[in-house]
Structure formats: structure tokens, C-alpha cells
Amino acid sequence: INDFIGKYKERLLNRRECKKKLRLWYELQWGREKAIFERKKIMYPYKSFENRFAIDENNSFSSADVYSFYINKEYEEIFSYEYLVGLLNSEVYNKYFKINAKKISKNAYDYYPNKVMKIKIFKDSNYTHIEDLSKQVLQRLKNGESNISDLEYKINNLIRGSLGI
């Protein structure tokens, strides 16, 4: 252990759990289950200027500054990852989140999971259209295309129509 993290011992000893003698200096702060990471999920940064939700299909692990969530089993047949990402990254949901989020600098917001998990999600007759457009956005991005504004515009209009705004 000393060979790998010994040079960080003083810094690690300053963690709250070490000061309270709940953990030894070389122990992880919080244990993690591999299965949580090794699955399809939506990932997003802890701090951001705007909503930046992305689908992870590569079983990625992340640092403390990246959070993720997955669709609970009882909702897997109701909502798709593509639909959720399309909704969450929309202009409407970006504004909606910023109204409720903690601002941490002039333009940055705190995307702490307790706030993100309270975001209301709807499903109506525009579901399939939003999902299809979101899939097109993802395909363009996978192909290295950066111009997705036409698709985002359509998604935003569908969401506004669904919400009556």
C-alpha cells in the first residue's frame, strides 16, 4: 500500500472518516458495488453550466465528480434511456432544473443526485417522436457529427407541446 498511496497519507488522513476513526487512512471512503457500474446507465457531471446527461453502454466507472443512475426494473418497459436523455438534455428541462438547482458559481450548477432524482418525467403521445429524435441525436454524435440543433429544436417543440408551454 505504501508503494502506491503512501505519498498521499497525510492528505488521506484529513478525510472526515479518518479523523473520526471510522476508516483507516488507506481505506476507500465508501465502498461501491461493481454491478452498479457494469450496466447500462445515464451519467452526468456533478457540476455543469447546463444539463449534460449521456448514456453509458460501456460499463464505465467514474470519479467522484461524475454521477449515474439506471432505470429501475419496474420502469424498463415504460421509459427508454434514449427518451430520458432527450428529455433531460432539452432546453425546457435545462431551465426547469436550473430553477430548482443550487447555483455554485456565476453560471455553474450543482447536479447532486438528490436534486436530479426529483426531476419529474412525463410520458404522453409524443413519447415515440421524442425517443426517435433522441436516437437520431445519439447516432449523429456517434458518427462524429456535431450539428444536432435541428433535432434538438424538434425535441424542444414536442416537449413544449406536451407540457402546454
List each model region and its residues.
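Non-catalytic DNA-recognition/assembly elements of restriction-modification systems
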Residues: K123-I165
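Polybasic, glycine- and aromatic-enriched phosphate-binding surface used to engage nucleic acids
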Residues: I1-T128
